[in-house]
Structure formats: C-alpha cells, structure tokens
Amino acid sequence: MSILKLHAREIFDSRGNPTVEVDLYTNKGLFRAAVPSGASTGIYEALELRDNDKTRFLGKGVSKAVEHVNKTIAPALVNKKVNVVEQEKIDKLMLEMDGTENKSKFGANAILGVSLAVCKAGAAEKGVPLYRHIADLAGNEDVILPVPAFNVINGGSHAGNKLAMQEFMILPVGAENFKEAMRIGAEVYQNLKNVIKEKYGKDATNVGDEGGFAPNILENKEALELLKSAISKAGYTDKIVIGMDVAASEFYRDGKYDLDFKSPDDPSRYITPDQLSDLYKGFIKNYPVVSIEDPFDQHDWAAWKKFTASAGIQVVGDDLTVTNPRRITKAVEEKSCNCLLLKVNQIGSVTESLQACKLAQTNGWGVMVSHRSGETEDTFIADLVVGLCTGQIKTGAPCRSERLAKYNQILRIEEELGSKGRFAGRNFRNPRVN
C-alpha cells in the first residue's frame, strides 16, 4: 500500500521546544510519529535542523524541517507510489534526495519523522504489531523484553545542580519479567524520594529533564550512596545493579576533566584521564556498578581503549559512536567500548538505526536503546527495543508521562506476548536470541 498523503507540523517536546511531527496516510488509516531531541549531543550526530531565527522560539523553531517534508519529501514519496513495507527503499530515497552525509539539507528531524511514520504504516500494512515488523526488518525471529535502566538521579546538562555526571541509573536485572522490573523501579524511586527529602529537604526532590531527582550535591559518590540506601530500604539489594551515563564530553577541558564544571573555571582542579579512570574503578569496586556510558570525551580514544580493556564491565558508547556505522566501525577496531547506545535521531532513519544495531551485535557488542532528554509522547522506541532484541532500554525515571509512555507500551507488549514473552533479566548485555 502506497502513501496517500504526508503532512508535517511543529509540536512541542517535553522541554517546551518545537519538534517535528509527521502524519502519514495510507488506505489503512493515519500513522503519526514525533521526533525527539537531545541536550548533550555528540558533535558527529546527524544534523537536527533548527530555524535559527532568534525572534521565534529563541532560534529553536523547526519550520524549515517541516517545510522540507511538506514541500519536497511528501510530493516525491506520494508520486513514487512505494509500498510502506519497503522501509529501506523509502529511507534510501530520502537520503538520496537529501544528498548530504549528515542530512543537513532536509534535517535529520525531517527525514526521521517520515521514516518512523513509514515504519508504523508498514506494520499496519502487514497486519502485525510494530515490534514484530521491526523484528522482521532486522531479521530476528524472536523478540525479547528489555531490562529498563531507570535514570533516577540527574546531573550534568540535564539538571541545575552541581553534579558533573549526568545519569545514575538502576537496572532491576533480578526481576522475573518486565512488569516486576517496573514495580521494583517504581518502589526504589519512591524510596529514593524519601531518602533525599530526609537528607536535603523537600525542594531537593524536584526532578530533572528525564524525571530523575536532581539534589544539589557535588560528589558523584554521594549519588551512588543515595541509590545504595534507597535500594536497601526497598529491599532489592540482590535484584538491582547500577548504571551511569557520565557524558564526560560535557566537562572535557584541554585533555583533562573538570568534575566541578558548573562552577567558575579553575584549571588547577582538572584531573587526568587516568585519575578519572581510577575514580570509576573505585565506584565499580564499592557499588554494584555494571555499566558506564561515555566515561571519556568523544575524542579521547586512548582513554576509552585503556578503560574498556581493564574495567571488566559494560562500557557504552554514545557521544563516541552517535549511532553512526562509520564511528562504530572505528570503535570496534580500536576496542574502545563494548556496547552501543542506539538513538534513532542521532543517525536519522529507521534503516540506518537497524544497520547500526546489527553492526554492533555482529561484533559482539551489547546494544542499549535510548530516548533523548527532549522527548514526546511517541512510543516507537518501546517497540524498537523489543523487535531488535537488545535486552536493555533507558528512557528515564518512572516519572513524567513522556518517559512512562515508553515503559507502559512495553508493559502492553509483554501482556500481548503472554507465555511467549522472554525477559532479558541478568543476560541484558547479551540476551540469547533463538
């Protein structure tokens, strides 16, 4: 079934900034997709086209991207009469029309909006759930329910506190299924709220962009202590492990790192990559930290390689790899990390996201599907993580509706799968796919 009509508009993301939404019509009905947006972005990401008109939305409008869909992409796809199940063919058409390496002509936000809507329409055309259609596109016979990585303490560019490291996450790997993982996550979250309130006062329980708490603490170790205390109070010490997203590129200064980067600049407090690595190893030794994302700057290849070789945990590339096959290939060759963070808007199409995932998995890496800090109510990544069988997803705390929208969709998928549903659990890094 081909596309009858395609229409894009400006809507608002969870930070109140404009983003692109696309409506796609076939004989099966209307299929809608919205595009997310990040705060700490890797410099190698595909280009998110903003208007840069300072008189409108402080330059963050997306009317140009919307216009590219409505004036150029829509007529071309409608005229071509391509069947919506042909995801790769449609994505390739858009990439050829754009003609740039980083999608700077149309904007990755324009191309992705259409690509996501096409994928949803393709599932309906085949009469299967979206996760099943994605599994088919990826060549997976099985589907797997992921372990959620709840970002319950926010720092870095996601919060107005002094904390340098961006995310402190809990992963309920000991849960029996996704539903229980949600319960464990929610109970620890409520316990954490009480722990923070008792220690720092009620206003310390305000939440950051992703629904996690953002108490005004400076020491990263203090965040881990808060987690340890909340996990213990909830009674889940044996069922939860900890993950971190350091987003170290945000505080990289002249070959060193500034763990107090939100204060006035003072080079005397900068630490070396080796000192930072030792700090992480202390965390791994003293807390159940099993996953660290972006421990070093996106250009600090030597530090990544050294740490991954010696840390013995999951080391996740985000700013380093930006869901880009060329960057992933380099990271594989350099042995820089062992897990890919998969963000559809970093690369800008469903087909390329699937290729990035396959490339990582083929090389023995884990893959973690991820939201962005500026999100919408769109739930595409919930189906994506199940269909790609990656076994792990991070889409915020169990708080804020744009985060829960994804988790709730996975709950529905688990219910629908019934006895066929397999939960990744402790095998989240490398779930067995039949």
From Swiss-Prot:
Location of the active site: 210 (proton donor), 343 (proton acceptor)
Named cofactor requirement(s): Mg(2+)
Enzyme Commission number(s) of this protein: 4.2.1.11
Reaction catalyzed: (2R)-2-phosphoglycerate = phosphoenolpyruvate + H2O
Keyword Magnesium: yes
TM ranges: none
Positions annotated to bind substrate: 158, 167, 293, 318, 370-373, 394
Subcellular location: Cytoplasm
Predominant location: cytoplasm
Positions with a binding annotation for Mg(2+) 2: 245, 293, 318
Cofactor note: Binds two Mg(2+) per subunit. Required for catalysis and for stabilizing the dimer.
UniProt key word Chaperone: no
GO molecular function per UniProt: magnesium ion binding; phosphopyruvate hydratase activity
InterPro entries registered for this protein in UniProt: Enolase (IPR000941), Enolase-like_C_sf (IPR036849), Enolase-like_N (IPR029017), Enolase_C (IPR020810), Enolase_CS (IPR020809), Enolase_N (IPR020811)
Metabolic or biological pathway: Carbohydrate degradation; glycolysis; pyruvate from D-glyceraldehyde 3-phosphate: step 4/5
Subunit structure: Homodimer.
Family statement drawn from the similarity comment of this UniProt entry: Belongs to the enolase family.
The protein, known as: Alpha-enolase
Organism: Sceloporus undulatus
